[in-house]
Amino acid sequence: MTLWQRLSESSHPVALVFFLAFRLGALFTYMFGLLFTDKFVLMFVLVVLLLAADFWNVKNIAGRLMVGLRWWNEASETGESVWVFETADPQRYINPIDSKVFWMMLYGAPVLWVCLAVLALLKFQFLSLILVFIAVSLTVTNAMAYSRCDKFGKANNIVGQVSGGLLSRAARGTFLGRFM
């Protein structure tokens, strides 16, 4: 079975396509954009726009449709920031293809952006490093929020299967462990 056939079995193919387009579009534009033009500012703006679209899409549409989770941040009456997490009805059918693609890309993108940050640092490309820090902050925020939102452990099961449990055990002992 080809990748296209598997993805066509999605319960929400439009949400899946936009999820992948924004997430991969930002990465590919950052990595290969300067091959097509020498205008760094244009690439910077385009990547930031793709990252913003990805953040909004994941937070408001893809997470709700693909895995039945949603989160937002609001200010309480005392002015404190309060994170609100919402989970769909546990009886709701979650398509395994949607779920696997969502969780793997949700956790995979920040890892790729961190690798690109290390590369930019080693190459002394400090303007690129600013862009990569924006990407890391947006993708990690979504990843941490959805990890906290996932009451039933769907993400932890998928991450455990993919990494053999190494990532989840390592994350529990670090800063990320507070959010998991």
From Swiss-Prot:
Superkingdom to which the source organism belongs: Eukaryota
Topology term for the membrane: Multi-pass membrane protein
Key word Transmembrane present: yes
Keywords from the named record: Golgi apparatus, Membrane, Transmembrane, Transmembrane helix
GO CC term (a single one): Golgi membrane
Transmembrane segments: 13-35, 40-58, 101-121, 126-146
Main localization of the protein described in the UniProt heading: Golgi
Assigned protein family: Belongs to the TVP23 family.
Name this polypeptide is given: Golgi apparatus membrane protein TVP23
Organism: Yarrowia lipolytica (strain CLIB 122 / E 150) (Yeast)
Encoding gene, per UniProt annotation: TVP23
